[in-house]
Design a protein with these regions (language model features):
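Catalytic core of pol beta-like nucleotidyltransferases
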Residues: 1-23, 32-38, 49-104
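Short beta-strand->loop micro-motif that forms the acidic, two-metal-ion catalytic signature
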Residues: 43-47
Length: 104
């Protein structure tokens, strides 16, 4: 599978902002399954070292990735996820993303 340029740019922006707290991305949803269409969004989990405030980081991620969305004309849906909870599969979304997603 070819990783969309928008995802590469997201990774660069997030790594630059979070530094060592950034543990990677998980691409999941229709793009990861190879079933995306022209109107599909790009679903990402942003893996971060805990602890963090979910809503504050969600807001920050939206702000960081907004320029990428404008430049690439791609809708990006990105959510922060604590690395330990993702790896432990404590939430259904994390279990689904682990099963079908691509860790970047």
């Amino acid at each position: 599978m070819v990783i969309p340029e928008a995802v590469k740019r997201c990774r660069t922006a997030l790594e630059g902002y979070y530094g060592s707290k950034f543990e990677g991305l998980v691409l999941y949803g229709s793009v990861a399954r190879g079933q995306s269409g022209p109107a599909s969004d790009i679903d990402l989990l942003v893996l971060l070292d805990p602890p963090f405030d979910y809503l504050r980081e969600l807001r920050r991620i939206v702000e960081l990735l907004y320029p990428v969305q404008l430049d690439t004309d791609q809708l990006i849906s990105a959510k922060p996820a604590p690395l330990d909870e993702f790896e432990g599969g404590s939430v259904q979304l994390y279990r689904n993303a682990k099963r079908e997603g691509i860790r970047l």
